[in-house]
């Protein structure tokens, strides 16, 4: 909808359950969460079990470029709203089905909640610390990734339909989307038997690439994109001799000795404050950032520019 499409959301007669969610701030007396996900959309309330309402849904589908659903597999076919049923009267129609686990998985009929997808897709296993175990990724990774990949599929499918006059049916699964976002972890594990483990506040294959504590507040340092960042970093910290230490000669070696390196860095950073290091490392072109709270982020990016 934000890109200019007319989006018609079909809700049950009682409305999307998210409308009634009163957790957090309200917008005009309604759910702020619902507004976040649905602003710009039009809404129609229909009972698809009623023939008259089902006919209305079919008319909407046949007048649209794309029909998108997030039902469990088989539901759209039951209502005659699947691509095979509609394409006879609308050859250019694009159908996108987003589900938790796709249509042929043994889990196909299972409910696809975000936390379940995080668990089954490996995301939980690499989040958190080894001492405390897996931790919930505190945003809707599976939900959001599935929606984004579905949006990409829609854009590509509409382009094809406009060129050929024929639409297709596509499936997107939240689980596949979350696994794809795991990136290197899946690649390494699949090819070389890489043993994934919780990343804690850094990355086991990158160093220094982590959260570090200063004298007062933590910062993030990512001095691994190019060797010059590493050299600039250790120069600012006054430990340039590490460039000749065989344990830290390159990222591969630094990753193998990450605990030793982390201890050295922490010892240096804890002498000065966060703001001091942000200034000095920034001047040296070292990738560094403060760790902002969500409140600080909202204030920073909604405040008028000076």
Predicted regions and their residues:
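Conserved Rossmann-fold dehydrogenase catalytic segment
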Residues: 103, 131-139, 162-178, 197-204, ...
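N-terminal helix-loop segment corresponding to the beta1-alpha1 unit
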Residues: 1-166
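Short Gly/Pro-enriched turn/cap motifs at secondary-structure boundaries
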Residues: 34, 199-204, 209-211
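Conserved small/polar residues in nucleotide/adenosyl-binding loops
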Residues: 301-306
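Aromatic-enriched alpha-helical interface/lid elements that frame and gate functional surfaces
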Residues: 208-284, 288
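Oxidoreductase and adenylate-handling cofactor-binding alpha/beta cores
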Residues: 147-167, 180-191, 234-240
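Glycine-rich beta-alpha junction loops
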Residues: 14, 100-102, 174-179, 216, ...
